[in-house]
Amino acid sequence: MKIKTLEIKNWRSIKELKVMTQDLMIIIGQNNHGKSNLLSAILFFFGEIKHQDLDFFQGAEELFVDIEFSELDDQDKKTFEKYVTQQETIKVRKVAYLGGSFEYKGWIQTCLEDYLKEENAGNYTSRETASSLPFYQYLPPAGRLSKQQIIEAQQKYIQSNIRNLTFSYELEETNFMGLKSVAKGIFGEVYFLPAIKNAADDFASKDTSVFGKLLGEVVETMSQHNEDWQGTKQQLANLFSKFSKYINGVENTERPKQLSDLENELSKELLSWNAYFDIELNIPDIDSVLKSNASVWSNDGTRTDIARKGHGLQRAVTIALIQLIAKRQLQSNQDSETTNRKVSKSRYFIFEEPELYLHPQAQRSLFDSFVELSTSGNQVILCTHSSNLISIDKYKSIYIIKKENEQYGSKVTQCEEDLFDGNQKNEWNLSYWINPDRGELFFAEKVILVEGQTDKVILPALADKLGVFKHSYTVIDCGSKQNIPLYIKLMNKFKIPYVSVYDKDHQENKSEQAIGAADSATKAILDEINNELGLSVELVNDIEQELGYDCGKSGKPFQALKYIKSSEFHISESFAEKIRVIYK
């Protein structure tokens, strides 16, 4: 199963927040705006971290995290049967209280028919009463009826007639699944890679480490299928059976004399206490022995443990471990059958700034790995400061978190619907190759949308010359005038301030038809602009005319840059004012 919706209230900088999730979630935003708080709320729900009094939003005495799960497999439906809705989802809330306590509660789709309400089950334990009710066929044919049998019959009847019944959706008053505490991992495995972590911890042989989990799977497989391994375990069992004082209730005459002598000597010393000693040697768990004595070495020309390698390699190896576990689990899920297990097979991978210590090319490769991981039945959630871990064509996976003020707390902006269709989608995807670093726009204070490379080079250079350049502004080459509206759509959806810079394209040598096409392209830009977020600046008729220089057809950006750096260049006051407006 996977997270479908996430609702948070009163957690750290988050007063109230609800987001629709994706298989891949990329959380971005400025420092101290709530990215890590969003991740930590998810970790709190899964039991990976404990809440503290400082985690409560501004004086709140209660906080909660609600998660709705979808894509339940047959085993999940069986495990969480009580909570499965008509839409085959379940919703669970983890509540924490100031002072330390917490509890899980499930949302229950309650049938409005009184005879199907769980709280009324005790009224129907009389067989005479129960026999008149529609769910009677699901009860045992004879014997006394218990309240639990009535509840189970109610649930079976509801499942069989779910489309013909009316429901309300309410938070249960009792604990989730009737348990005072929910076992860690009941909703699936969580793998969390924080921003700062000692890679040696992941390669420790303990069961909770990433490597320990992977090694545990290998040892379990060997234990079940390797004949030599099974033979060794049997030999150990035979050996240790000789140390037992009794075998099947009969005294063991082959027991080593040294053990019996030690028992007798100890008993003799405590004769006045009427105390007698038995020494029992238990068979060691060879699986645990092997795991606890494992060590991992890395050889990149020099054989050392992983802690003595560079941070980049340490980070890469940890991520590789996680990816390997995901691949093995995918194969395991395909081969397994429904069982009576009480935990979900789901896996959630949570990364905090995974780009740390990795060069740009490695970051881009890592992002491809995350995409592959998210399309293999897993859910991947990460927060990042790197544009290399963002793909603009996956705009539905992008979550921009902002904290406008302390009173309202952190809020998320996301896009749930398709922005483009048909040719627009193709043009949007093609424009990636024109501007592969366009993911940077999501981190910008303001985005400057331009038609081509010459504009992208010249506008910042002129802004620098005029003393108005700002590093927090990003210039995006849209590839053509016709593509600018596509970017404006995206800016509007994510509420990113922007300015659209386009050519009027009314040159004297142009035909009426060409001018008409240019005007249509201009209108498409102006129609798309949201005046609360963006504005437009028109160049007459293009940047070359504004500069008063013909750059030629070859190497236009470089030729134009040489010109504005030369002593003969003087910018017109009208063009200078446009530059100031763009960088305002």
Give short role names for the model-derived ranges.
Residues 1-47, 258-261, 289-292, 296-437:
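Switch/communication elements of ASCE P-loop NTPase nucleotide-binding domains
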Residues 19, 56-61, 83-87, 183-186, ...:
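Conserved catalytic network of the ASCE P-loop NTPase/AAA+ motor domain
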Residues 37, 74-237, 514-533, 554:
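Glycine-rich phosphate-binding loops of NTPases
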Residues 39-89:
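Conserved P-loop NTP-binding catalytic core
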Residues 49-52, 77-79, 166-183, 280-281, ...:
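Short alpha-helical segments and helix-capping/turn motifs at coil-helix boundaries
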Residues 60-65, 87-92, 186-190, 346, ...:
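Short glycine-/polar-rich loops that comprise or flank the Walker A/P-loop
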Residues 86, 184, 434-449, 453-584:
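Acidic, Mg2+-coordinating catalytic modules of nucleic-acid enzymes
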Residues 185-187, 195-351, 510-511:
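Extended helical coiled-coil dimerization/tether regions that scaffold
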